[in-house]
Amino acid sequence: MSMDNLVRLVEKDQYKQLPDFRPGDTVKVHVKIVEGGKERIQIFEGIVIKIRGSGLGKTFTVRKIASGGIGVERTFPYHSPVVQKIEIVKKAVTRRAKLYYIRDIRGKIRLKERKE
């Protein structure tokens, strides 16, 4: 068995079935957090501003506005065991793959809703 086949075999078990989402979509990411001996689920809701990579190395970044108007960005590995599930709250139409310009916008961000 070649090394390439061995890597594919190991990676196959790591893949997760998560919903398809795009930059601009509002998502709820359910994250498992371990504190001491306890585990709990924390929900991080925000707008997907970028998706990069492919395969097991695929990541996505979600931005939300926390209390006090401070922007919080968090990058998640797509196939990580820490990510329990992803819920799509709202789908949006964007013309860019990376929505970095959202960082400079103050107040509520209006994105056109995508109909399917």
UniProtKB/Swiss-Prot annotation:
Lineage top rank: taxon: Bacteria
Pfam family, one: Ribosomal_L19
Cellular component GO terms, alphabetical: cytosolic large ribosomal subunit
Single annotated GO MF: structural constituent of ribosome
Keyword NAD attached: no
PROSITE patterns: RIBOSOMAL_L19
GO-annotated biological processes: translation
InterPro entries reported in the protein's UniProt record: Ribosomal_bL19, Ribosomal_bL19_CS, Ribosomal_bL19_sf, Translation_prot_SH3-like_sf
Annotated keywords: Ribonucleoprotein, Ribosomal protein
PANTHER family assigned: LARGE RIBOSOMAL SUBUNIT PROTEIN BL19M, RIBOSOMAL PROTEIN L19
UniProt record similarity statement: Belongs to the bacterial ribosomal protein bL19 family.
Its biological purpose: This protein is located at the 30S-50S ribosomal subunit interface and may play a role in the structure and function of the aminoacyl-tRNA binding site.
Protein name per UniProt: Large ribosomal subunit protein bL19
Gene name of this polypeptide: rplS
